[in-house]
Design a protein with these regions (language model features):
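Von Willebrand factor A/integrin I-like adhesion domains
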Residues: 53-55, 132-184
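Structural motif
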Residues: 85-87
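Arginine/glycine-rich "motif VI" loop of SF2 helicases in the C-terminal RecA-like domain
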Residues: 26-33, 77-78, 124-131
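Generic beta-strand/beta-sheet core signal
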Residues: 39-42, 89-90, 136, 162
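An active-site-proximal "capping" alpha-helix that borders the catalytic cofactor pocket
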Residues: 14-29, 38-39
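MIDAS-like acidic motif and immediate structural context at the N-terminus
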Residues: 1-20, 91
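VWA/integrin I-like adhesion module and closely mimicked acidic/polar interface patches used
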Residues: 58-63, 92-154
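Short beta-strand-loop
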Residues: 9, 32-62, 68, 74-79, ...
Length: 184
């Protein structure tokens, strides 16, 4: 829910919420034995109740992907489930990081090497914990696409590339089957 979701006159937040609401409905109705937690990440990360998703608003300016993944990992490890996965809906650019002393390091200029390194370290922690990260990417910037490819490759997850105009169609990169296909 970072501010980047509404930058440059393009609302990526509303489509992201639509995807999250649809996934929530699917899981609650078709996979009733599964549990679902929602984590919003911006300058930091927070868990929100399922009922609060529809009313969620764009938050602070930066995207602390590492903190969002860390919180999601903690929530998943607290549950006694065989299959653990994170479904991340993002516009892709990690631009903030929580430092060991609690301060937030922010850099919105390009992909900051330190933020990227620490974010990928958290992705690796997810993999070590047996957590797959599947990503819905709502942007087409090549650097961000490459970042999402790295996340998916590390965790053997899937990456779905779309935009706000073609949310019903997306490009699926399946890192388990090593295939790419267009889905409508």
């Amino acid at each position: 829910c970072s501010h980047s979701m509404i930058l440059y006159g393009e609302d990526r937040f509303t489509p992201a919420k639509k995807v999250a609401l649809a996934l929530t409905h699917l899981i609650q109705t078709q996979f009733a034995g599964d549990s679902l937690k929602l984590v919003l990440f911006h300058d930091s990360a927070e868990e929100i109740p399922l009922g609060a998703l529809a009313g969620a608003q764009v938050g602070p300016y930066h995207t602390n992907t590492a903190e969002g993944l860390k919180l999601a990992r903690r929530l998943l490890l607290a549950q006694k489930k065989d299959m653990r996965q994170i479904v991340m809906i993002t516009d892709g650019k990690p631009s903030a990081l929580t430092m060991p002393d609690g301060r937030i390091y922010k850099n919105a200029m390009g992909l900051d090497a330190y933020v990227l390194q620490q974010t990928l370290a958290e992705v690796t922690e997810c993999r070590r914990a047996g957590i797959v990260v599947n990503t819905f990417m709502l942007a087409r910037d090549q650097a961000l696409v490459e970042f999402v490819k790295m996340v998916s490759s590390i965790t053997r997850g899937r990456a779905y590339f779309t935009n706000t105009m073609t949310l019903g169609q997306y490009i699926l990169m399946d890192f388990l089957k090593r295939k790419t296909r267009k889905v409508s």
